[in-house]
Amino acid sequence: IFFFFFDHGSPLYDFQTLCHYVDTDLAIIDKEKPDVIVGDFRLSLSVSARLRSIPYISICDAYWSQERALKPPLPVMGFTRYAPIALSQFLFRRIAPFAFRLHAQPLEKLRAKFGLPSLGYDLRRCYTDADLRLFANFPALFPEVNTHVGADFIGPIAWSPEFTGDLSFLAGEGPLTYITMGSSGNPKVIEKLVPILESLGSRIVITTAGKPLSFIPKLPTTRIFDYLPGSAVCQKASLVICNGGSPTTNQALCCGVPVLGIAQNMDQLLNMEAIANYGAGIVIRADRLARATLRQAIESLVTDRKYTNRAQHLARNQGLESRPSTLSGHILDQYTKRKFTS
């Protein structure tokens, strides 16, 4: 349901849902009595935590930061497959402020219900409001975001589940491409990618998140799994192809691997825009998947070392040396502030 609303441009949560979330939040808060609350896109927590006067830390993405100007890219919608992108983008930029205000309305209504001040119907603030916002991104991707007492970079979160299976197949000869479109991606995209990669001599590892594929690979060097530990695969890969979302791009870039992001929604497009601007990847809109376009992008990423060099530079220089090295440092800081100011 979440991805349906996100991809179709509808508000992610309605007022009644957010009210229910606040009730659930408060029940847990009153039972557990936390000193600090840490949330990840749980929009109701910006209300619930304030109602109990508990410091709230939000883990979020810097491309939604109010410290940078938001130039909203046109997401993929039904009509964009047929409309000229330049014209559609021009028109979208002009109606986006009204659309964002509509998206912000449920949370603004929630805040008004509980006597909290308005966030100015600023969607960036509605998505990230907290006492401390921690950006789970590489600082180098967002040089225009200046950190301060209420906002800092915690660095990319590249989590993978523990895996006890055999990964020896990753050690074969030749370049390896890792394809994963995630739970929100369209598996039909994979069917377009595999023949191109096979023709270029790449070994291929595909994870489908349990979604069925309607084709059978021609070569034994193409292997398909429901799930694999992404970070482990990225360590052996020379290219990662995904939906452009930050969970997978963080895994790839932490391993110094360039990314081809086939992006659909605004979140993915904003993330990949920063990566492409840095030179560590290429973004293709999911409504512009011509075979020639895909092949050109893949060949560029595989043959032009500049993309790999930029990805490796990013992995080596995360720019976090002067900041608290762990989330616990930020939590302790918020706890201390509460302890001595309450």
Residue ranges, per PLM feature:
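A donor-sugar binding/catalytic signature common to diverse glycosyltransferases
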Residues: 36-41, 225-274
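Phosphate/nucleotide-donor binding subsite
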Residues: 1-35, 89-90, 105-107, 222
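Donor-nucleotide binding loops and adjacent catalytic segments primarily
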Residues: 140-239
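Active-site-proximal region of nucleotide-activated glycan assembly enzymes
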Residues: 57-143
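C-terminal amphipathic helix plus adjacent low-complexity
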Residues: 291-342
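An aromatic- and histidine-rich active-site surface loop
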Residues: 37-51
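Structural motif
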Residues: 35-36, 132, 176, 239
